[in-house]
Amino acid sequence: MLLFLLSALVLLTQPLGYLEAEMKTYSHRTMPSACTLVMCSSVESGLPGRDGRDGREGPRGEKGDPGLPGAAGQAGMPGQAGPVGPKGDNGSVGEPGPKGDTGPSGPPGPPGVPGPAGREGPLGKQGNIGPQGKPGPKGEAGPKGEVGAPGMQGSAGARGLAGPKGERGVPGERGVPGNTGAAGSAGAMGPQGSPGARGPPGLKGDKGIPGDKGAKGESGLPDVASLRQQVEALQGQVQHLQAAFSQYKKVELFPNGQSVGEKIFKTAGFVKPFTEAQLLCTQAGGQLASPRSAAENAALQQLVVAKNEAAFLSMTDSKTEGKFTYPTGESLVYSNWAPGEPNDDGGSEDCVEIFTNGKWNDRACGEKRLVVCEF
């Protein structure tokens, strides 16, 4: 109320001309209502004053602080699906799942075609000796066996009676020179020789003086006794040499040799193809082992067992397939083939090997086997 009275007082104090000019100015304006500029009121309160003019625009103020963010609008409608992107990298392998239950067994398939026979494997180690079996029934008498190996030389027996003169033997090898013996007594005079060719007649000589009568000659019996003593001494030396040779042969054969009858099997322990093995034995003065009896085969088997290696034999069927012969070309007089052998597996088995069990098998000559020479 007080503000209203102050406004009326200001209007009354203004000059009349000024008021009229102001009224004219405002009369030209479009007035929506008669009470727009002058508020209508009762007579008691007086007229309100006019609005003042707008002042000049002041300088721009500093930028105010940002207002609080408005409330988020509602989510818009989803846009159209974009194009398919490139394939991503494979992810890491996941952990294996639990093992599934065993499915039912399927029906048995048809039997496959038998594969080709594999190559014979290496020789296995000799098995342990099995338990002794029960004695079987007594068999029939077998054929007479071969002559066994010569036994050890026995001790010298008592001197027997002189036997009849034997046939002249084959000259023996030259023995070791013995010590020089004592000079023997002069032998009996031999028979007179046949007269020589007649020489030219010589000059007649003077008659000589008769010589003294010679001494009586010794009897021939002591000469026979002396010869007998010499023969006995030579026999003792021969026996000594034979014993020494037998002992030397045993030492030489141990442990890589075997003697049976007049044969000696010897190995140096190395393995070679057949051709090289054959050449080595030939250069040493022998040939590859050629067992011609069960005894010789058993002696050779001992060397094979000691070395635990199969060994080549000298026989081949390179000339006629299936017909094995010795190096001399003669047919076999003894054989000890394993069951089902020889079978010429692969069409290239022309040589023979002996296993640790003493059985024979045909084998390719290019394979390497133990070298055993025969002397």
From Swiss-Prot:
GO terms for biological process: defense response to bacterium; innate immune response; lung alveolus development; macrophage chemotaxis; negative regulation of interleukin-2 production; negative regulation of T cell proliferation; positive regulation of phagocytosis; reactive oxygen species metabolic process. Residues 50-65, 204-216 have a biased composition (Basic and acidic residues). Residues 1-20 form the signal peptide. Disulfide bonds join 281-373, 351-365. Residues 260-375 form the C-type lectin domain. The modification 4-hydroxyproline is found at residues 78, 96, 171, 177. Residues 46-222 form the Collagen-like domain. Expressed in lung, brain, pancreas and adipose tissue (mainly mature adipocytes). It comes from the Eukaryota. Keywords: Calcium, Coiled coil, Collagen, Disulfide bond, Extracellular matrix, Gaseous exchange, Glycoprotein, Hydroxylation, Immunity, Innate immunity, Lectin, Repeat, S-nitrosylation, Secreted, Signal, Surface film. The modification 5-hydroxylysine is found at residues 87, 99. Residues 105-114 have a biased composition (Pro residues). Pfam families: Collagen, Lectin_C, Surfac_D-trimer. Residues 223-252 form a coiled coil. One of its GO terms (cellular component) is endoplasmic reticulum membrane. Glycans are attached at residue 90. Residues 66-86, 116-132, 138-150 have a biased composition (Low complexity). Residues 45-221 are annotated as: Disordered. The N-terminus is blocked. Hydroxylation on proline residues within the sequence motif, GXPG, is most likely to be 4-hydroxy as this fits the requirement for 4-hydroxylation in vertebrates. Belongs to the SFTPD family. Contributes to the lung's defense against inhaled microorganisms, organic antigens and toxins. Interacts with compounds such as bacterial lipopolysaccharides, oligosaccharides and fatty acids and modulates leukocyte action in immune response. May participate in the extracellular reorganization or turnover of pulmonary surfactant. Binds strongly maltose residues and to a lesser extent other alpha-glucosyl moieties. Oligomeric complex of 4 set of homotrimers. Pulmonary surfactant consists of 90% lipid and 10% protein. There are 4 surfactant-associated proteins: 2 collagenous, carbohydrate-binding glycoproteins (SP-A and SP-D) and 2 small hydrophobic proteins (SP-B and SP-C). PANTHER family: PULMONARY SURFACTANT-ASSOCIATED PROTEIN A (PTHR24024), PULMONARY SURFACTANT-ASSOCIATED PROTEIN D (PTHR24024:SF15). This is Pulmonary surfactant-associated protein D. It comes from Homo sapiens (Human).
